[in-house]
């Protein structure tokens, strides 16, 4: 994935019928980067963390309606340790409801590899940090960039007090050598091995999608997605 991604996530929600006068749209900015991938942790701390802070604190200070999502307890810990002044600004914006703690884990989880206990502890340590530092808790599993999601995920999430899950990675199944099975649904309820259920966005679309500056009010594509699920909602990366 890119070294740093600024995603615009838009959620279009219709009360019952998808029509222009009953649609509500939320545009929320989000930054996502791996703690380490084709770079080391030191580079994340030295370069990617301050870029995320500088860009988004500027936008928060400039535009009163700007809101921002960011995930990963370990990244917040780095902010606290290496950028304490900006960290205090983050805490203020969290109190104001403009900086949202996304996800609930200490760092991005790979549900294909760890044991159930390691997955649960990842949530436990992340939530403990968020409660101690910000007085809030995450409500979801946020994994835009993971290569598979086991049937145990809804069960672990539900037993951890979480209510949601989202990803864009299932669209990779349509690429060569990744299989041809279809994505189960865009938005709906995902039931785990023990019958526990959470709200799930199975297809948030590619996080490098380009918006062509078009009016989406009458988009048949978005209408079809909204009408295909009981919430009449669309969750889409731009």
What spans do the regions from the language model cover?
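Sec-dependent N-terminal signal peptides
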Residues: 4-15
